[in-house]
């Protein structure tokens, strides 16, 4: 077991965003976290990465309680994420964006590397090789010198994944990675996430594209109004009446097709 979410609750004033939510993720899984808008999915990501402190409950990663651990140390322990809203360095090149992500695994600080301290030259070269490898993985190897803001939306999504992978995560959190993608880009994203899984990285994904989720995930937890509604395999979730009802009463074929 890589991650255990244990009885997590989160209140914002008098509003309960999450209430006593628990689930576990096994090593090597692609695990889906789904639910209608406002269900508490991104709040859960923010708690896992300690951008928010939980009101109650604990986060256990590889057997260690990490509740309250500073976000940069959570990253160093092997958890990295992407965001709903793309957070790239838009004026930096594609390669530079991934290099920044790689620095969390470097003994050299960003500023020492910028100053080109001689003792760090070899490490900097190794980091660049790793960054180029990841850009090849996500299909951006021909765009390494392009400024990030000039990439298409789908390409920026892939760059954000490459930057997250640069820190060598054991657990990768993807927050709506298919948002804004066309069908071809979504198919390519599926292949990319499957390749990430083959590399031994566990994936926790929030996604509203139900066909992608059902094809991609090994198991799924469904949240609704901050509470755990259901958990199971894609087949079990597709046949769960409570899940269908949670999606505003939409017919099953419309939700999952």
Which residues does each predicted region cover?
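Glycine-rich phosphate-binding loops of nucleotide-dependent enzymes
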Residues: 2-257
């Amino acid at each position: 077991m890589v991650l255990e979410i244990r009885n997590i609750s989160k209140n914002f004033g008098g509003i309960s965003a999450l209430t006593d939510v628990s689930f576990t993720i096994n090593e090597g899984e692609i695990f889906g976290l789904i639910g209608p808008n406002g269900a508490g999915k991104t709040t859960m990501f923010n708690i896992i990465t300690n951008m928010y402190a939980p009101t109650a409950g604990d986060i256990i990663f590889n057997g260690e309680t990490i509740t309250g651990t500073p976000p940069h140390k959570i990253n160093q322990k092997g958890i990295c994420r992407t965001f709903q809203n793309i957070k790239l360095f838009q004026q930096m090149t594609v390669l530079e964006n991934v290099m920044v992500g790689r620095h969390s695994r470097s003994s050299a600080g960003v500023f020492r590397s910028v100053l080109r301290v001689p003792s760090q030259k070899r490490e900097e070269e190794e980091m660049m090789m790793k960054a180029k490898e990841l850009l090849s993985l996500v299909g951006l190897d021909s765009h390494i010198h392009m400024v990030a803001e000039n990439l298409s939306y789908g390409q920026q999504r892939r760059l954000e994944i490459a930057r997250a992978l640069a820190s060598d995560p054991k657990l990768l959190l993807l927050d709506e990675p298919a948002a804004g993608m066309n069908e071809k880009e979504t198919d390519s994203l599926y292949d990319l996430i499957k390749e990430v899984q083959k590399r031994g990285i566990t994936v926790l994904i929030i996604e509203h594209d139900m066909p992608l989720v059902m094809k991609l995930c090994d198991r799924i937890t469904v949240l609704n109004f901050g509470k755990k509604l259901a958990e199971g395999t894609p087949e079990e979730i597709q046949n769960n009446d409570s899940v269908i009802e949670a999606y505003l009463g939409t017919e099953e074929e419309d939700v999952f097709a």
